[in-house]
Design a protein with these regions (language model features):
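The beta1-alpha1 cofactor-binding region of Rossmann-like NAD(H)/NADP(H)-dependent oxidoreductases
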Residues: 47, 67-79, 110
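Canonical Rossmann dinucleotide-binding motif of NAD(H)/NADP(H)-dependent dehydrogenases/reductases
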Residues: 3-34
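A glycine-rich helix->loop->beta "capping" turn
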Residues: 59-62, 82-93, 101
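A short, exposed helix-loop element centered on a Lys and neighboring polar residues
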Residues: 128-129
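Conserved glycine-rich Rossmann-like NAD(P)H-binding loop of the short-chain dehydrogenase/reductase
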Residues: 30-51
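Substrate-binding pocket helix/loop in short-chain dehydrogenase/reductase
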Residues: 104-105, 109-114
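Active-site loop of short-chain dehydrogenase/reductase
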Residues: 6, 61-62, 89-90, 135-146
């Protein structure tokens, strides 16, 4: 299946697997919304929404970098609406954003757990739910949860 002209909304697409999916889709000529929190370079982690957008466009796609923290409903709604307005809809929702803890259960405090749950469970649900009205209008819609 070609992704030419299809629009992907990808959470957490500024680096890693999300960026790899975005660049691969761009090679087919896809439109990609890069919805992530990283707008400024991080000293330990590569990539921002803007560097990701540049990579997507170099690969042949169209990019829309959007600052978005998926824990917040108003940010997700604005990002999804902005994507649909720019590209005429959304065909694929990729839930890639995540938070992890490399500590054991007894060493993971509740603040860290709440962050992980807020992004990994609630944020994934929120992004999917917000994209669904647009996905229902697409010819062959998909939701990918990573």
């Amino acid at each position: 299946m070609s992704l030419k002209g299809k629009t992907l909304f990808i959470s957490g697409a500024s680096r890693g697997i999300g960026l790899a999916i975005a660049v691969r889709a761009a090679r087919d000529g896809a439109n990609v919304a890069v919805a992530a929190k990283t707008a400024e370079p991080h000293p330990k982690l590569p990539g921002t929404i803007y560097t990701a957008a540049e990579e997507i466009e170099r690969a042949g796609g169209k990019a829309l970098p959007i600052i978005c923290d998926i824990r917040f409903e108003e940010q997700v709604q604005a990002a999804v609406d902005q994507t649909a307005a720019k590209f005429g809809g959304i065909d694929i929702c990729v839930n890639n954003a995540s938070a992890i803890s490399l500590t054991g259960t007894l060493q993971t405090d509740m603040k860290r757990y709440d962050l992980m749950n807020g992004i990994n469970a609630r944020g994934t649900y929120l992004v999917s739910r917000t994209c669904i009205p647009y996905l229902k209008k697409a010819a062959n819609p998909h939701v990918l949860n990573l």
